Amino acid sequence: IKRLIEQVSFEARTNEFVDKKSGVSARLTIAAYEAAVSSAERRAIIHGQSNTQVWISDLSGIIPAITGKIELVYEGEQEGPYEVALNLLNKSIRSIFVTYFPNPDDVKKRKAPKKSANAPEQKQPENPYAAIAKWFDAGNHLDLFLDMKDEDKIIELYKVDGLFGIVKKHFPQAGEKQSALLMEFVLHGLSSYSIISKKMIDGKIEFNDMMGSMINLGDMGMDDDAFNDYA
């Protein structure tokens, strides 16, 4: 979580919508971290829990901290502070994700080995995210409410085929809650690489397959912006 928040500051310093002359406030990282912790504490109070952990979904609470600590150029103002902040957060997730898990772009670029009449059949390159993508492609979707209990969130995350498997493969020593946090991170990471879709609406983050998400938006006559889609 700390690395993601720190990365937001780095992304802001190179973003085309952020005013380079005014710079990025040194307090952005501190303010954002405090906001994320506050979101987690609020959820614990709602459910009468004595402790909880900061989830990736709690980072939705750092948006005001980001918008309050950066100055935008004219194009950024036209885009909207909220959208710029979401974009920075998404780029942060995208950048950090590949330091923990295989790069989805590399997976997309893999080509099947060429067949030869005399050579034995070669095994297809493994796609570590195939099971996850297939689960969503089958019409499944996952709703993670911002205020849901830790236990309920963990149950929901384990419903996604292949999600625990990839975390266990790369972090075999992770405990239950740490694994669940990494599982949530995988979903956000895959959405940042357009493997699955993600949108926030009505106090929840909904993960879906890319095609189904586009069809639903088309049926309702609305575009991504109407849902603050930041996948």
What role is predicted for each listed range?
Residues K21, E41-A231:
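C-terminal engagement/docking regions of AAA+ P-loop ATPases
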Residues I1-V54:
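Conserved AAA+ ATPase small/helical "lid" subdomain
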